[in-house]
Curated annotation (Swiss-Prot):
Name the record gives this protein: Nitrogen fixation protein NifU
GO molecular function list: 2 iron, 2 sulfur cluster binding; iron ion binding
Keyword Iron-sulfur applies: yes
Organism of provenance: Nostoc sp. (strain PCC 7120 / SAG 25.82 / UTEX 2576)
UniProt cross-references to SUPFAM superfamilies, sorted A to Z: Fe-S cluster assembly (FSCA) domain-like, SufE/NifU
Keywords attached to this entry: 2Fe-2S, Iron, Iron-sulfur, Metal-binding, Nitrogen fixation
Span list, region Disordered: 201-220
Length: 300
């Protein structure tokens, strides 16, 4: 039995704004509809919006849905949330906002709030006469989940927007991986890639300290091992360690053997599943950039 909030149960037993908005020629307003999901897959939502043309405001909204308790409650909540908003304001409503309005949803039911957000986007784009294919970048790229027709771009977007960390969460949000399960490994790879890209971005943004000033006498002679170790330690202390420490980790220089730099990852970095990304992106790339492009970093 799912643990639903009182608000979810209230809108399930007594849903607001259920039904259709017909286009009846009323002056100054226009009706548009957005549809997502599939009855064959177990969830479908049709969202209707009535828009005051002059102000671009949503004056009424109704829904029709085929789905569970969470689907009905999420759809009902959405129709209440968007009334009085301009179309641009409504486009900012996220699936998280819908879930928050309901006081939370079981994670296995988060896909219902995602459907609401997508139906709203579809309705607004239909109102504006923009073909859905023109804005739906989620449908581009390789298909990851053939059971539910979910592309790599959509998986990637949902992972980034909701800070998801495993394939089970992705299944809960957009159903990908919930059929035969053959795509779960691919979903894990996408999550890992998102984490690595985020780590690289954080390093660049937080690499807070100014670039280490590496002396350059203009001489062509290679660095001695003592000089190399001193420079590596300087870069680690001034540019790498502050970033890692801020995230609960750290790194210690263990040894330098030619171009092989051996380090010990500590704290969160030592137990993190993305430790390889930390080595290659956060440490190795920085040392190569500052000292020598042939340096290779290894953990011991």
């Amino acid at each position: 039995m799912w643990d639903y909030t009182d608000k979810v149960l209230e809108l399930f037993y007594d849903p607001k704004n259920q039904g259709v908005i017909e286009e009846n020629g009323e002056p100054g307003v226009k009706v548009a509809t957005g549809e997502v999901g599939s009855i064959a897959c177990g969830d479908a939502l049709r969202l209707h919006i009535k828009v005051e043309v002059e102000s671009d405001k949503i004056v009424d909204s109704r829904f029709q849905t085929f789905g569970c308790t969470s689907a009905i409650a999420s759809s009902s909540a959405l129709t209440e949330m968007i009334k009085g908003l301009t179309l641009d304001e409504a486009l900012k409503v996220s699936n998280k906002d819908i879930a928050d309005y309901l006081g939370g949803l079981p994670e296995a039911k988060m896909h219902c709030s995602v459907m609401g957000q997508e139906a709203l986007e579809a309705a607004i784009y239909n109102y504006r006469g923009i073909p859905l294919a023109a804005h739906d970048e989620d449908d581009e790229g390789a298909l990851v989940c053939t059971c539910f027709g979910v592309s790599e771009n959509k998986v990637r977007r949902i992972v980034i927007e909701n800070d998801l960390t495993d394939a089970e969460q992705v299944t809960n949000y957009i159903k990908a991986g919930g059929g035969c399960g053959s795509c779960l490994a691919k979903i894990d790879d996408i999550i890992k890639d998102v984490k690595e890209n985020k780590a690289a971005t954080n390093l660049n943004n937080k690499g807070g300290s100014k670039p280490t000033n590496i002396p350059n006498s203009g001489q062509k002679r290679p660095l001695t091992n003592v000089q190399k170790i001193a420079l590596i330690q300087k870069v680690l202390d001034e540019e790498v360690r502050p970033v890692l420490i801020a995230d609960g980790g750290d790194v210690e220089l263990y040894d330098v053997d030619g171009d092989i730099v051996k380090v010990v990852l500590q704290g969160a970095c030592g137990s993190c599943s993305s430790s390889t990304a930390t080595l290659k992106i956060a440490i190795e790339s920085r040392l190569r950039d500052r000292i020598n492009p042939s340096l290779v970093v290894e953990a011991v």
